[in-house]
Each structure stands twice: as C-alpha cells, then as structure tokens.
Amino acid sequence: MNNIWWQTKGQGNVHLVLLHGWGLNAEVWRCIDEELSSHFTLHLVDLPGFGRSRGFGAMSLADMAEAVLRQAPDKAIWLGWSLGGLVASQIALTHPERVQALVTVASSPCFSARDEWLGIKPDVLAGFQQQLSDDFQRTVERFLALQTMGTETARQDARALKKTVLALPMPEVDVLNGGLEILKTVDLRQPLQNVSMPFLRLYGYLDGLVPRKVVPMLDKLWPHSESYIFAKAAHAPFISHPVEFRHVLVALKQRV
C-alpha cells in the first residue's frame, strides 16, 4: 500500500488538516503554515498522486478521501481548497465523527456548470483534459493563471503557485486527468445538506472558477453553514490575504 506524504507541525489542542487543490501540493500552504502552527496542530498533506505522494493512479473522490483518512488524526478541522474542498467534504459525509468542523476554500460542491447552476463550462474542463496529453506543464500553468486573475497581486500570486508546482515532480498525466474528472462530474449539493458539524465556506469575490453568485444559492441550500467572502481575493485567498485568512480560522477555532 502506498503512503500519503504527511507532515505534522505545531502543538495546538485542535488539529487542522490542510488539503491542496488540483495540480498542486502541500507546499502551497507555506505562506501561512508557520502562523497557523502556533494556533493548531497542523497537518500538511500531498493528495494521492500529487507532490510527494507518488505511486497512485487516477482515483475516484471516494477512494481519494479514504486514502487520505488512513493517516489522519482521530478528529480534526478539515480544510480543503478547491479540489481539496471536495475531498474534505467527502470525508465529512462518510466519516462525520472524524470531522470537528468542515472548511471549504474557493470550492464548489459542483464545479461544473449545470442547468441553473454556475460553474466551469464542461467543454472548458474537457479542453483542459485534452490539452494535458499535448502539453501538460503549459496546461497546468494556464490553470494556475486563471486562479489569480483579477487580484491586485495577480502576477505575484501566480508566481507563488507556479513555484509550488515546480518545487516537486509534476503529477502523472492520468492523476491530473482523474482530478479534472472529479471536478467535471461530482455534485455534492444535496448530500451536504445533511452534515451537522460546523461548516464554514470561504470565497474570493474575484474568483473566476467558483462564481460568487453561487454563495447565496448555497447559503439558502445549506442554512446550517456560514459563508465568508474575501473582498479582493480570487481563487487563492490564503496567498493574497494570508493575515485575514488566518484570523478567520483562529476565530473558527474559538467556536469549535
């Protein structure tokens, strides 16, 4: 059985697991990990097939969640960014006793646009899948550029994301394709109506991948959850607004 790359730091009385997004790895959290580890016992994870978690092929969302959970603390706040938000949500649905609170960051329960639902057009996701086989490094870079577009620090933030990708070996094409397939097909809108733990959803007002118009729709669908929008952030608010991001998480800790 292959192991997930996992790093634990800090000695807070609350565990916080951080799950990164598509194409990236746990190095993306380095902009906030020192500060967070003074408040939490922090767990940095490379999702299966990404970063240092080698030897995994394409996986379903359920299998990815189970693989991550095998090395996790008994109970933690689970925070997932983008694709990682789906993994954290899946864990909250299947193992609620392990989840002290669920936090999703720039994530959607259904990334793909559907009838009366805003998201990424399916042909855009299919296009990324096609381009991966032609020039996957350039495709990943294009996807990263989309994530920071519109912010005051867009170039700087895009460079930070690119540096994270290039710091470690690139994921295999089938792993990247598998991640895109999850983004294209998964829809957790109805299942997440049933979670009972504290549920905080964080968004960037300028996010081009998760439109802000879904926020009030989910406020209505999930009245038990809370939402918070970073006014000048795009898809990676923890990179563009690290201090504000940390304050939001520390405030959550006081409540759970």
UniProtKB/Swiss-Prot annotation:
Keywords: Biotin biosynthesis, Cytoplasm, Hydrolase, Serine esterase
Ribonucleoprotein found in the keyword field: no
Annotated GO biological process: biotin biosynthetic process
Segments forming domain AB hydrolase-1: 15-242
Cytoplasm in keyword set: yes
HAMAP family: Carboxylester
NCBIfam families registered for this protein in UniProt: bioH, PRK10349.1
Protein name: Pimeloyl-[acyl-carrier protein] methyl ester esterase
Naturally occurring in which organism (per UniProt): Shigella dysenteriae serotype 1 (strain Sd197)
Lineage per the UniProt record: Bacteria, Pseudomonadati, Pseudomonadota, Gammaproteobacteria, Enterobacterales
Gene name linked to the record: bioH
